[in-house]
Amino acid sequence: MRALVALSALALIATVAMAQDSGPKGISASAIKWGPAPGALPKGGQLAGLSGDPGKSGTFTIRLKMPAGYKIPAHKHPHVERITVISGEFHFGTGDKLDEKGASKLGPGGFVELPANTNHYAFTKVATVVQISGDGPFGIAYVNAADDPSKKN
């Protein structure tokens, strides 16, 4: 639940910034406002809300900036997750444990759609930015509770 609240709070920034009217909404790359990723994600990541609110019903789009060596242990989401690689290399796989040898790699422009409740993991070897779209309310549940960064001090 804390992960949902943290993602929702971040998306509020984007919603307020882009909800000036009901017309087309655009934002240049240089205007994207980055902040620390919520506690449900490993430290070192940065998140930017582009549209919608992941904590509420409806569609949303966020970006996640990850440094080289960033690892997100096996987890799942209650809804479909759609990921597009903006820059760098995004490594991902399905299963109950992070498996670097069994992972697939996507470069800029690459796309993956992960079905709801599918255990998966991700990692980077170089600095990487991905765009994540989905339907809320969005959340994250780690396969191994000990991997959940929000539960660590």
Region annotations inferred by a language model:
Residues 6-15:
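Bacterial N-terminal signal peptides
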Residues 53-55, 67, 90, 96-117:
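Short acidic-glycine-tyrosine-enriched beta hairpin
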Residues 41, 54-59, 73-84:
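His-enriched metal-coordination microenvironments in redox/metal-binding proteins
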Residues 72-74, 92-93, 114, 119-125:
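Short beta-strand His + acidic residue motifs that chelate non-heme Fe in jelly-roll/DSBH
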Residues 1-4:
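Positively charged n-region of N-terminal signal peptides that target proteins for export
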Residues 23-27, 101, 121-153:
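Double-stranded beta-helix
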Residues 18-60, 145-153:
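A short, N-terminal "cap"/entry segment at the start of jelly-roll beta-barrel domains
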Residues 67-70, 76-97:
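Glycine- and acidic-residue-biased ligand/ion/polar-headgroup-sensing regions
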